[in-house]
Amino acid sequence: MKKMKILSFFILSLAIIIGIVYSRQCDDKCKQDYPYSSCNGNLNLYRGLGYDGNGNVIFSGKYNSSQGSGGFGLPSIFSVPSSGGCQLSKRFDIQGEILDGPGYTALDYFYKYLPQLDRYYVRFNQRGSPIFSIYNQTSNEIKAVFNIFNTPFVPAFSQNESAPFFVYGGYGIYGLAKYPTDRSDAQQAKLIYQSQIVNGLEIDGDQLYMTTYQGQFLKGSLNCLNCTKDQLQLLVTDSELASATSVSGFALTSDYMYFSYSGGIKGYPKNGDASRVRKLVSENVVAMISNGDFLYYQTDSGVVKSVSTSGNHPQVNILYTPVSDNQCQCSVGFSGDDCRQCDNGMVLWASDNGIPMCSPLNSLGKPKTCYAAYQCGSSPFIICNGTCTCLPGFSGNDCTLCGNGGEVIWENGYPTCVIQIKKIIT
């Protein structure tokens, strides 16, 4: 069986310090200075939730602009108390988005937060390819882990961080006795079950629970190695699960397994007893996680809620409803009262929405982020791939060095570094 195909991709490790996002109370001046500044509209939540082990639900999002269409500024990680109260706290901004050009990179999904490691697993859209990544909030580094393009990728993490185990579904189910941190980890993963494609996956001790596109709830073992999928135990089949366009979440409690979809949240006992099926909520759910006897979920309108799984009458509690914080923020990298200061930086303009960004210059006078090659200077040896980069084979500050004894071949005004391989005759 083939393991999940890991394609080569640009962002192996990217640390881009774009700058501080300045904010103040929204006023008429803020609106007049658009697009250099904007009053925040409602917070647009990205799909996915996490739990910090300290009574807070975590999610990601970006404020919409009240003047233009779409998001404005940097995306951020937020949290709200799981007990309710709608007290939103911003944990940190996420640097490194490149919203135009060949290096396009944008956050679009929140997978998991590991509190002991203080590690955030997220997904970036990088030039049309979804990248399963780690974001380091201390170094502002995006660390790409797996390229999951054209793969039915479903991750699952062991709850005990002291005994880490990671399982993922692709064209088969694979396991790692660690939490992944590098793209090479996919090559080290062991095949647990052949060919099985899932849309939900969870670890419970040394057992695996999963859902399929055919509406099946299956149970397996982490101790299996290269097992065939017919060795999985069928627990129950659900017609709504089979007909769902997509399963947005799969979660376990002490005695039940639940899935979320456009029709709500539904669950069965872990033994598959269909007579004890439960329908907790009946609204469009786009993300769901569990903690103890509570499920936390996100609706298609961005509302974050909790529902108790104990008792005969589930209690739903609203944790957060997307609203504006009435703040004015400068466009990324800009500062000053009119949000037009771009100190030691280059102004880049996004072609789709006309929003400027101030990209700091590096020690060579090149922007740390670029949208097009001309922003990197007039040298034909330098291209823009999100950052100003030497052409393949070239190196040096001006990118004119051609390997060890290489020859520069020019064609139609473009250089190519050609390394001659000499045969040694014995």
Swiss-Prot record:
PROSITE patterns listed in its UniProt record: EGF_1 (PS00022), EGF_2 (PS01186)
Sequence ranges assigned to domain Laminin EGF-like in this UniProt record: 325-348, 384-408
A Pfam family hit: EGF_laminin
Induction: Induced by srfA, during development.
InterPro entries assigned: LE_dom, SrfA-induced_signal
Statement: the UniProt record of this protein carries the keyword Signal: yes
Annotated protein name in UniProt: SrfA-induced gene K protein
Source organism: Dictyostelium discoideum (Social amoeba)
Taxonomic lineage of the native organism: Eukaryota, Amoebozoa, Evosea, Eumycetozoa, Dictyostelia
